[in-house]
């Protein structure tokens, strides 16, 4: 997911996307703890997507949108 794509979404869509990613990250963390993690590369992708969403949300809050 690119930051430019995220900037086109409104705040509600960003919050929804963030919540989905956080849930997926939690599920992956549980799988890793149980030793059943199939795709460890997914961790870094999710973490970076979460950071991108939070960055866009912070940009908007600083700009006063």
From Swiss-Prot:
Disulfide bonds: none annotated. Keywords: Ribonucleoprotein, Ribosomal protein. GO terms for molecular function: structural constituent of ribosome. The keyword Isomerase does not apply. Pfam families: Ribosomal_L29 (PF00831). One of its GO terms (cellular component) is cytosolic large ribosomal subunit. It comes from the Bacteria. One of its GO terms (biological process) is translation. Transmembrane segments: none annotated. PANTHER family: 60S RIBOSOMAL PROTEIN L35/50S RIBOSOMAL PROTEIN L29, LARGE RIBOSOMAL SUBUNIT PROTEIN UL29C. Belongs to the universal ribosomal protein uL29 family. This is Large ribosomal subunit protein uL29. It comes from Thioalkalivibrio sulfidiphilus (strain HL-EbGR7).
């Amino acid at each position: 997911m690119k930051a430019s794509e995220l900037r086109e979404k409104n705040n509600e869509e960003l919050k929804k996307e963030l919540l989905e990613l956080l849930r997926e990250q939690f599920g992956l963390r549980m799988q890793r703890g149980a030793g059943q993690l199939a795709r460890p590369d997914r961790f870094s992708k999710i973490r970076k997507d979460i950071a991108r969403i939070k960055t866009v949300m912070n940009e908007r809050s600083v700009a006063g949108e």
